[in-house]
Design a protein with these regions (language model features):
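Ubiquitin-like/PB1-type beta-grasp interaction modules and other compact soluble beta-rich domains
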Residues: 1-70
Length: 70
């Protein structure tokens, strides 16, 4: 499956589609419990990760929000 991940081409070998949770695992995303996922321009609710299928040609962004400063 060929995707665009964080603006760069990416391939997940041997898969035609995955749910978002499986994609996080397949791509070895760091701290998956803290990542926000944008799929094809839409921010996803974490509760939808299992039921949402990522398909060939999709665009995925992994976003991390961090606090800090004064």
């Amino acid at each position: 499956m060929n995707l665009t991940v964080n603006g760069k081409p990416a391939t997940v070998d041997g898969e035609k589609s995955l749910n978002v949770t499986a994609l996080l695992t397949a791509l070895k995303v760091e701290q998956p419990d803290y990542v926000t996922v944008e799929l094809n321009g839409d921010i996803m609710d974490r509760g939808d990760f299992e039921a949402t299928t990522v398909k060939d040609g999709d665009t995925v962004e992994f976003l991390y929000f961090m606090g800090g400063g004064k």
